[in-house]
A protein has these predicted regions:
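Acidic, surface-exposed loops and disordered segments
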Residues: 1-168
Length: 168
């Protein structure tokens, strides 16, 4: 529970490299996510190459932190593995698990949306040489935090409805 409430979007990182063990731990958390009919329609592209990380902000306006990140992981949906249209939910669950594991491991992270924005999908597919059946869903930027952000309580009782919709 601590990681859930402590997790914050971190966009500034130190120069310390992430170990392969930490990256694997984060990937294992992503792959532990629930998926519809247990299809697990995901693939993950680890980006450590600074030249590639510098290209992404040219087409993704909210990814300016990537050149300073230790690495990024692109969460992709594989339409050849998905029997239906639930792969975005599955990739969302995988992305969230990765953010929580990063927090638990002391790594800063931020979720960068790709899908369904074609102006982000197509350039990223080209940059990473992704096959036609692979759709980039999100990018998780990772690095040792060079900033701190305090957790906040987002619970809002006015958004809770019991049995049917009523204003509380």
């Amino acid at each position: 529970m601590e990681a859930i409430f402590k997790r914050r979007s971190i966009r500034k990182y130190t120069n310390q490299e992430l170990s392969d063990e930490i990256i694997e731990k984060i990937l294992k958390a992503g792959m532990a996510a629930p998926s519809a009919q247990n299809e697990q329609p995901w693939h993950f592209v680890i980006i450590k190459d600074k030249n590639i990380l510098r290209e992404i902000p040219k087409f993704h306006p909210y990814s300016k932190m990537l050149p300073g990140a230790g690495c990024a992981i692109v969460v992709c949906g594989d339409t050849s593995l998905a029997r239906g249209d639930k792969w975005p939910q599955d990739c969302s669950a995988a992305t969230q698990n990765m953010l929580l594991m990063a927090t638990e491991a002391g790594i800063g992270s931020v979720w960068l949306g790709i899908y369904p924005d074609k102006d982000r999908i197509e350039p990223l597919k080209e940059l990473l040489n992704l096959p036609a059946c692979i759709i980039p869903f999100s990018i998780v930027s990772l690095g040792y935090p060079a900033e701190t952000r305090e957790p906040n309580d987002r619970y809002d009782a006015s958004r809770v409805h019991i049995n049917k919709w009523e204003n509380l």
